Amino acid sequence: MAAMISFNDVSKCYPGGFEALKGITLSIDQGELILFSGHSGAGKSTLLKLIAAIERPTSGSIIVGQQNIGTLRRSAIPYLRRNIGMIFQEQKILYDRNVFANVMLPLQVTGFDTRTSASRVRAALDKVGLLDKERADPITLSGGEKQRLCIARAVVHRPSLLIADEPTANLDSNYARDIMAVFESFNQVGVTVLISTHDRMLLDSTRHRIIELKQGKLVA
């Protein structure tokens, strides 16, 4: 069976000469949950952004769902991302909207009808344990609850792939375990989950595959 995602000798160099990734070759199968570890600046975030076509490789090839990210037309990127749920640190919660409306936003953008959207939003909130908070203002949520809100927004369109960049950063160990349990619950129903983290507690306690990066290279 072909891999869901494959990197073949991928490098990424930014303007100014900084090489974030160097000769990365790896395969990811459908249904895996993988933790990407490494120091700050190791290349974890860049790798995830390449998968979502937020960045493009400088050299090498990346195949995601049989599509070559390096040659993918700009007009095709929204279709690729319909199958990807993304949680990045720079994503912002909209504090002028309640929890329900925050999760509804991706469905409004893609043109879902109101009834279907409402059903999907409540299903996503239920999955992350926030259904009783749907009318709450985000400012009233705890740090862990805000991260659950971001996860619900990422999965409301029911993607087959979920990528999360440092999702437990700035959370205490109990909240971090809760967030990891949410990701595992999605993985248990077949969603491929890719998480970048340098959270030692998560890395030491996981039973899932760990891929370590150091200065842009895979650690053997």
Language-model features, listed with the residues they occupy:
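ABC ATPase NBD coupling module
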Residues: 15, 69-85, 188
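The feature captures the beta-strand-to-loop junction immediately N-terminal to the Walker
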Residues: 37-39
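Helix-to-loop junction immediately C-terminal to a conserved catalytic motif
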Residues: 52
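Conserved ABC transporter NBD signature motif
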Residues: 60-68
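Conserved ABC ATPase signature
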Residues: 137-141, 145
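A short, proline-enriched helix->beta-strand linker immediately N-terminal to the Walker B motif
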Residues: 156-160
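Catalytic Walker B motif of ABC-type/P-loop ATPase nucleotide-binding domains
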Residues: 162-165
